[in-house]
Amino acid sequence: MTTPNYMAQLGATLVDRGFPILPIQPRSKKPGMYRQGAWHDYPKWSRHCERATTENEVDIWGDWPESGIGIAAGCVIGIDIDVLDVGVSAQIEGLAKRFLGDTPAVRIGRAPKRLLVYRAAQPFAGFKYPPIEVLGLGQQFIAYGIHPDTGQAYDWPVESLADLNVSDLPAITEAQAREFAQEAYVLIPAALRPKSLSVGRQAVGSVKAG
């Protein structure tokens, strides 16, 4: 089955609306580059977190077959709720909207996991309170593509990100994001918490599919 070229379809629109983007390998979580007829890993993708995407980049990437689209986090923040319990996931989404604002940008990959998108008042690095992760500078999340586990397209059930401007998203600070993540972590049953020593630590260079 042929995967749509999301970059060709939506890349320029997202950039015009203020989103920093990067190419994602087909049916993958990974940023990629297309060279000599094949996709390869993109080692320096995190540089896109620190600057706007250029028109020339979008033109080049749009010719790469079956390219997905990632959002380079930093000025845009992803709140990743990596929870497969329907009730807990919905509860944490509600908490995020109370703490951080009622964002219209909610992305579903493997339901009931979900990711909420916000605008950073000032760019900041991401951090984890597993299974909650705040994705910031040096990280990315998938906006459009085929989820590698479900084989289905990522869904935006409220409003598609390509229909929004960055300015439409509620602005948040690192302090607000940390307060939310700490409160959300308390709501997660012990059985759903991964055994990890990284609670509250910065998470740099992450690749997230959701």
Indicate residue ranges for each PLM-predicted region.
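Conserved phosphate/metal-binding and DNA-contacting active-site motifs used
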Residues: 1-209
